[in-house]
A protein has these predicted regions:
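Carboxylate-rich, polar loop motifs that coordinate divalent cations or form catalytic acidic clusters
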Residues: 1-268
């Protein structure tokens, strides 16, 4: 695929799925197949409809856009089906009512904006409206357990509990002291540490065991962090915007380059 790629997922068969500016491509190891997203007879190909790609715990692939349309991959018919869309008449002044979408471990798709969180239950297909008491644009979410979450925003990070269809903010002085635009979060349940990637403020770590925020000595503070990915039991890969790929030791917090490019465009 030579198209611009926004998201990549690998399914249980081993196929690679790429969300691009023209739709969804699947690579089976030999060839690419393109999938169109259809709303009735109309193809959904606006960039406001091609934003997030997730695979749930049962291996089902989901695509979500900023206009609030949710597509589910139908393996039997080998196509994507539109299963839900936000009523756009409620957002006549907002062309993109969803600023962030996320799939949790409780079979809920979160459709978030500054005022409201819409929870779409992938089993029952019911939608619950929850007031966003954070009143900030959500940029990433990590689930701690059945009902507790770390929520990153354009202003910082919050600790919250989702219970009885309400999002309750829980005071955490150390986390509230983190004032930065959060770009990515990674929570390791085994060691109970939250790795926080930011826009031009580097990397921070919140240790739930000691209730402290650690700032590594070398923390890539002049580089924007785009993604964390586990490398092994002890290390995380760190993708950056323009600074190559690094890795961090989750015990010592030492950060070292993993993949960087030289001026001859070769990899080191």
């Amino acid at each position: 695929s030579n198209r611009r790629v926004y998201c990549i997922q690998k399914d249980k068969t081993g196929y690679m799925w790429f969300l691009t500016h023209e739709g969804i491509d699947r690579y089976n190891g030999k060839e690419f197949k393109r999938y169109k997203l259809m709303d009735g007879d109309a193809e959904v190909n606006s960039l406001l409809n091609l934003n997030w790609l997730y695979i749930d715990q049962e291996g089902v692939l989901w695509e979500i856009g900023k206009k609030g349309k949710v597509f589910r991959y139908d393996q039997i018919h080998d196509c994507f089906s539109l299963v839900y869309k936000l009523p756009m008449e409620s957002f006549s002044e907002q062309p993109d009512p969803v600023t962030y979408a996320w799939l949790d471990q409780n079979k809920h798709i979160w459709l978030c904006n500054k005022d409201t969180i819409f929870l779409y239950n992938t089993d029952t297909k019911q939608v619950t409206h929850i007031k966003n008491d954070i009143s900030e644009e959500i940029t990433d979410i990590e689930q701690i357990d059945e009902s507790h979450f770390f929520i990153g925003t354009e202003m910082g990070i919050h600790y919250a509990q989702l219970e009885n269809n309400a999002l309750k903010l829980i005071n955490c002085d150390k986390l509230e002291s983190v004032k930065a635009q959060v770009s990515d979060l990674h929570f390791d349940k085994k060691i109970r540490k939250l790795f926080i990637g930011t826009f031009l403020r580097g990397i921070m770590v919140y240790d739930m065991n000691t209730k402290s925020v650690i700032r590594p000595d070398y923390n890539l503070k002049d580089i924007s962090i785009t993604r964390f990915k586990p490398l092994n039991d002890k290390e995380l890969l760190i993708a950056t915007d323009g600074g190559g790929v690094h890795k961090i030791n989750m015990d010592t917090y030492q950060i070292v380059p993993e993949i960087v490019a030289d001026y001859n465009l070769s990899l080191i």
